[in-house]
Amino acid sequence: MSEDVLLEEDIWEYKSIRKRKPQSNPDSTSVSMQTVTKGKCRPKRKGSGNRKKSVEKNSTPQKSEQRLRPSEDLDPCKDDSSVYAQESVSSLTEQGSPSTRPVCDGYCPSCQMPFSLLVVQTPRWHVAECLDTPGSVEKECPDGLLCTSTIPSHYKRYSHFLLAASRAGEYLVNSTANTVERKMTCSTAAKSSCFPSPVEDSQAEKPSKNLKNVPNNECTSKIKDSEQRKSLNITSESTSSFADVQKPQQVFQLTQTTDNSCKFEFYDFTSSQESVSEDLCSQKDTSQPSLLQSKADFSDWEISYSPLSTCEESEGEAEEEKEVKTSQNKLLKVQNFEGPESNTEVFKFKKQHCEEINTSSCLYHSEKSASQSHVDSKCSNSPCVDNQQEMLSAESSFPLNCNQEFQQPGLLSPAINTGNKESQDKGACVLDSVYSCLTRTQSLLLTEGGRSPLSQKNKVLRAPSVVLTNTDKMTADATEKGTCQESLQPAVKKEENLDSTGVCFPSPISKTVSSHSLASMNAKSSPAKELKQMDIGVFFGLKPKVKEESKGEACLSEGKQIPSSVAPSGKRPRQQKRKAEGSVEDLEAVEESSNKDGGDANVTSGGQRKWRKRFRESSTTDEGARKKQCPFYKKIPGTGFTVDAFQYGEIEGCTAYFLTHFHSDHYCGLTKNFVFPLYCNKITGNLVKSKLRVKEQYINVLPMDTECIVNGIKVLLLDANHCPGATMILFYLPSGTAILHTGDFRADPSMERYPALIGQKIHTLYLDTTYCSPEYTFPSQQEVIQFAVNTAFEMVTLNPRTLVVCGTYSIGKEKVFLAIAEVLGSKASMSRDKYKTLQCLESAAVNSLITMNWDGTLLHILPMMQINFKGLQDHLNKFSENFDQVLAFKPTGWTYSDSCLSVMDIKPQTRGNITIYGIPYSEHSSYLEMKRFVQWLKPQKIIPTVNVGDWRARSLMEKHFRDWMIEGSGHK
């Protein structure tokens, strides 16, 4: 499975969560949380708008509170299928009787209404409606914390912020108790839904849930390596100031032995807590990948904010914050141990013995872990651990400014672990984000807003023991209240000599712990303060956005990089619209994005730059911006020639620029400042001089159907049957190879009589593939023209006061109105600009049929955009003395439908005295015409030039080409 797919799965939580087999362990006093789902279901995007809100309100650990996941299908008969594990270790049974109405426990995370009041709705249904219509009620319930109303409408009339905060506070306070029958909840703040999610229960992890809310603490962690035992030392300093930013170093030293065992032991400092032991991993007989929280995003990188945010509730949060601080202080009373350096708290990691890990399972978990840990600037530890012989140690020191608004919740969580026994695991979830860090990226960058990039030193990889040492300097700033947008990220560098297949690194920090910390952090802010919404780009398959890097800073490292951007002021970055990778418009603009530097561009993990909003990038860009690269299908190999490549500025190595015809999508970028040799035919040359004011000295006119020598290479221009002046270009290379570039063309059987193509072996055909799909079947040009002529003649014969109108482009579709004018015996009236354009054709026949006099003709030529009922009515009103009816033709290839296989299927639109015929007149080849031309020409190689932005479209076209050639050779 590719990295991109895993990242997207992380975002949308595409995980199958099954009921875990209950364990009856007499020695264990803690209970696992278990969630039963009925199959795997994709989450609704709707819930992503209020993730933070749901965390603030639903983090209450009610005894039998039912938890909902966005990936679960809850129907009225299955509401009981998702339950908490009871505090006894007896087996869980499903209670889903279809004959009785299920009574759901728990509370709505939005309005705090008990689910037991629901009559028809399911909890998920109710929560979804609450989130869709959040309500603007600012009046707090008069009962406050004592509200036990059983009237559903009561929860709509009043807000229950205090009740929500109280339930969240109970969650925090209870986490310090010694009871072993404690249920732990994982934060869903970074997930794509506002619903609660299944949780992991570990007594050793409870205290860490509150880390985010620790006030006035500057927590310095130092992880140190010793010879006898690899230990992890965390230094905790308490200061009264949290405004200053310190710059310490961090060294992770991860030890891996040569065998496949991956074990570590987790020791804690607090001796007053009970020892607990629990299996946190899924059993082999279940298909649940892991209970690890995926995508636990502790910043707002992958979300954009709804404008529905206020600051009015900040004063009302004082009491809530005091309660939260009280519970925090209880949790963070950690005994200090003196180590080699002062104020160090020691905790150790030992490796555990792993079963032979299934490759796909390991990669699945580790990739999902990495996608989170990269964003959260830490390597998360899988809670599935056993104690054995080998030790994993990490050495780091990094001070963090830990006020209420900004913390690294996961980095310090192991330091306050309250258990004295290690958590154990028999499953295959040891592989984790450290492994992913090593295998997925070569470097992980950290940029702190406004400050210098990471100073990376002492990066050592010792092959025998596989010890990865990394020293980073990290800084952290206090951010705006209630935001949590800054995050630190360690830089982990993968060396080339690392045998990644043999590495199985458990990392020292648990995602579950981090999620708890985030839940605690979010519980103190008002639920309606900020409504978060999933980035719309993610919905369309894009990778998650990251914050913009600090102004003017770029931490470039060798190879692929995953940036960790930190906003210097803690403000939310402005949401930007993103274009899908590989889109036709920006295909060439993305090709070289991974190796260019730009001041106003940001490199994402996919290698695509995010540009400021602009409609079209200029051909000659400013310094720091990226210049488009000419795609290969516009270059003629073995020559210095390019075809229709004017939007890329000066192309290196190009000695001649060819223009096939005068349509804007082909001459785009060609201006009066063009100073390179331009080659085209006479009609196109006249249009370039007249319309674009290109200097005549740079325009080289080539005659049609005549071999010419351009820079030592023979070139021949052929009629492309597209628009006036449109040509196909045949190149004869010195090696004897013949290359045909069709430009835009409408294949016609008459081309099979071109002398230059008869018997000519074509090596490469650059083919106009605008309609290269079987559904693009429409009548020939001659049939459509004949239909328009007959219809116009009949209408004018029946009513001589009929005005015939034909739509046209700046250049193109002329054949239709010229044929009508000839049959009606009337000139075609047109605007001065159109008249001058047709004068460039230098055709006596055309000049005899056109005029700028609107009054003396039966046929008027209007721009295509004016061929609608309103535009035609306005035009008719100007000539109401002579005409009382309008017959309009709108010749365009885009109005065809599957039913329009012949002109008999063409139906008019009529409103009053105005009739409009949309006729399927195309200047591009239909699928069958293209197929016939290719089978006749028999090129050795075909290169499509249109609709090449999508690999699926390219693959489909290549399949058509193969089928054509096989079918053509079979006829021989």
Curated annotation (Swiss-Prot):
SUPFAM superfamilies: Metallo-hydrolase/oxidoreductase. Pfam families: DRMBL (PF07522). Residues 39-54 have a biased composition (Basic residues). It catalyses: a beta-lactam + H2O = a substituted beta-amino acid. The keyword Protein biosynthesis does not apply. InterPro entries: DRMBL (IPR011084), Rad18_UBZ4 (IPR006642), RibonucZ/Hydroxyglut_hydro (IPR036866). It is an enzyme of class 3 (hydrolase). A zinc finger (UBZ4-type) spans 105-135. GO terms for molecular function: 5'-3' DNA exonuclease activity; beta-lactamase activity; damaged DNA binding; zinc ion binding. The keyword Magnesium does not apply. May be required for DNA interstrand cross-link repair. Belongs to the DNA repair metallo-beta-lactamase (DRMBL) family. This is DNA cross-link repair 1A protein. It comes from Gallus gallus. The gene is DCLRE1A.
